[in-house]
C-alpha cells in the first residue's frame, strides 16, 4: 500500500504554499450570459430537490451506519438532490446577498460560480486563482460589464497568502478547490482573516483523497480499482497512472484528469481533519457529507480488500465520505 508515501507528501504539502502558474498559452474566450442559463428541466429539478433530499436521509444513513459522519447535518449519495442547498443555508445564516462583497478562490471569469454570483444583486465579485488569467480577464472585462451589474475584479495568488486587507468580504465560496489545498491550516486562517465579522464561507469540495477515486483518475480502470491509489504500492501505482496506452483508449477527459495525481496537488486530509482546520480558524456552522456510491459498492463487493484498507488504519468514514459541503460563519 502507498500510505507511507501519502503521509510523506501530506507533510510536505502542509508546510508549503501552493505554487503559482504563469499565463496559459491559450487564453480564455468570453462566454455570454446565455451560455449559463439553466434549462427548464434543471429549474424544475431544483424546485423538488429539497423534498426529495429530506425523504432520502434515513435511507442514506442506514446505508453507511451511524459511525460514518455523525457530525454531518445531512447526507447525500453522489450529490443527489442537494440542489441549491448551499445558497439556501448561507442566506439563512448570513441574510440576503444584496449589496455584499464576495470572494471566489480558484475561479476565472468563465467559471460557473462566477457567473452565478454575477447574476445576483451582490455589490462586488472578486476572483483569485493560482493561474494568471490577467490578460484574458482584461480583454473580457468590457463585455462582462455590459452583461452584469456587480463590480468584478481578478487577482493572481493563492489561498495561503491572500492579497487583501483584513475583513474585506461578506461571503466566500469555493467549489472543488479545497481538496487540492495542501496547507489547509494557513488557507482557513487566511479566509477567516479577510472575512468580515458575521460573514459566511461556503465550501463544496471533493473527491477527498481517501475516498473512492480520490486521486481523480484511478477509477477510470473500473469499479474494482477505485481504491488502487491506496491499495497499490508506489511503483505499481505510478505504472498504472502513467500507462499512456490505457488512458488514450479511455479518452481525453479521463487522461487529462491524471494531472492532479501526477503533480500530487492534493491536501490528503480526512473529513475530520478539514473540520479541525475550520474550527481552529474560528469558523462554526453546518456541515453536509457526500457519500460515495462506488465506495459503498466496493465495500459490499470486495470485502477482503475493504478489510485490508480498514486494518491499515483508514476509517470507514474517510473511505466513504467523498466530499463535504460546509456553510460556516465567522
Task: Identify the meaning behind each predicted range.
Residues 161-166, 193:
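Short conserved loop adjoining the S-adenosyl-L-methionine
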Residues 173:
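A conserved beta-strand element that flanks and buttresses the S-adenosyl-L-methionine
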Residues 2-11, 147-152, 254, 258-330:
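A C-terminal cap/extension of S-adenosyl-L-methionine-dependent methyltransferases
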Residues 200-244:
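Conserved class I S-adenosyl-L-methionine
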Residues 176-180:
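Short catalytic micro-motifs in class I SAM-dependent methyltransferases
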Residues 47-95:
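Class I SAM-dependent methyltransferase Rossmann-like catalytic core
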Amino acid at each position: 500500500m502507498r500510505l507511507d508515501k501519502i503521509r510523506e507528501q501530506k507533510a510536505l504539502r502542509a508546510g508549503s504554499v501552493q505554487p503559482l502558474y504563469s499565463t496559459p498559452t491559450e487564453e480564455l474566450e468570453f462566454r455570454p450570459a446565455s451560455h449559463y442559463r439553466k434549462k427548464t428541466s434543471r429549474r424544475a429539478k431544483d424546485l423538488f430537490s429539497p423534498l426529495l433530499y429530506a425523504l432520502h436521509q434515513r435511507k442514506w444513513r442506514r446505508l453507511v451506519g451511524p459511525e460514518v459522519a455523525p457530525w454531518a447535518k445531512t447526507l447525500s449519495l453522489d450529490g443527489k438532490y442537494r440542489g441549491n442547498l448551499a445558497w439556501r443555508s448561507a442566506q439563512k445564516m448570513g441574510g440576503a446577498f444584496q449589496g455584499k462583497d464576495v470572494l471566489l478562490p480558484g475561479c476565472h471569469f468563465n467559471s460557473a460560480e462566477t457567473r452565478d454570483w454575477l447574476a445576483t444583486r451582490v455589490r462586488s465579485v472578486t476572483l483569485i486563482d493560482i493561474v494568471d488569467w490577467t490578460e484574458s480577464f482584461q480583454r473580457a472585462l468590457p463585455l462582462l460589464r455590459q452583461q452584469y451589474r456587480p463590480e468584478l475584479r481578478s487577482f493572481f495568488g493563492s489561498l495561503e497568502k491572500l492579497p487583501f486587507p483584513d475583513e474585506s468580504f461578506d461571503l466566500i465560496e469555493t467549489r472543488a478547490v479545497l481538496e487540492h489545498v495542501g496547507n489547509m491550516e494557513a488557507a482557513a486562517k487566511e479566509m477567516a482573516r479577510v472575512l468580515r465579522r458575521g460573514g459566511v464561507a461556503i465550501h463544496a469540495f471533493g473527491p477527498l483523497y481517501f475516498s473512492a477515486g480520490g486521486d481523480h483518475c484511478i477509477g477510470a480502470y473500473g469499479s474494482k480499482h477505485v481504491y488502487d491509489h491506496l491499495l497499490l504500492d508506489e511503483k505499481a501505482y505510478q505504472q498504472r497512472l502513467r500507462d499512456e496506452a490505457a488512458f488514450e483508449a479511455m479518452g481525453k477527459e479521463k487522461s487529462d484528469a491524471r494531472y492532479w495525481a501526477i503533480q500530487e496537488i492534493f491536501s490528503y486530509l480526512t473529513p475530520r481533519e478539514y473540520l479541525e482546520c475550520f474550527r481552529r480558524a474560528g469558523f462554526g456552522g453546518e456541515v453536509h457529507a457526500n457519500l460515495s456510491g462506488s465506495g459503498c459498492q466496493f465495500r459490499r463487493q470486495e470485502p477482503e480488500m475493504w478489510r485490508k484498507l480498514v486494518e491499515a488504519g483508514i476509517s470507514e468514514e474517510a473511505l466513504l465520505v467523498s466530499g463535504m459541503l460546509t456553510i460556516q460563519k465567522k
